[in-house]
């Protein structure tokens, strides 16, 4: 009889994520201290906001890239995800992320008929055609951050944008433990998909127990 193996969920702990994001954070902080922002400065700030939004909302990178202005409800600290992989959903965000989005909107390039929150800073790929950011762009950004920080996943592979979503789900499970709430936030159609995070954490606990020696007096 075959045992059901727990699906591998690649994630980083909170402190590892902070270390991974540190170079981007420092560049964004330096950019905000300038009176006039260059194009690279704006790109850095945009990337920093996207990364933090994806993590805070446990979004898929494609969902963040396709966000439109009409999807923002900053007053109530929410964003609406439409046509996501798991369907439409409401995503609550912390105050810190809302402030980052507001800061981005202050410097966001204004183009006629541009519905997207995040766009290419330098222009569009085709004249008169506004396109959202390409999610593949962030694959390259993550490779760069991984090379800068040396942060890797447990299996030795490099973090990628979806790592943020997995990492946020694990953090939420550790702090909340309510799989139904996490399922709603992640937009999972099936609770079994969400239960993977609980199984992964249970396996981590089991691994830890196996490495612990001592305790009470042995008989």
What are these regions (language model features)?
Residues 1-219:
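Conserved catalytic core of the tyrosine transesterase superfamily
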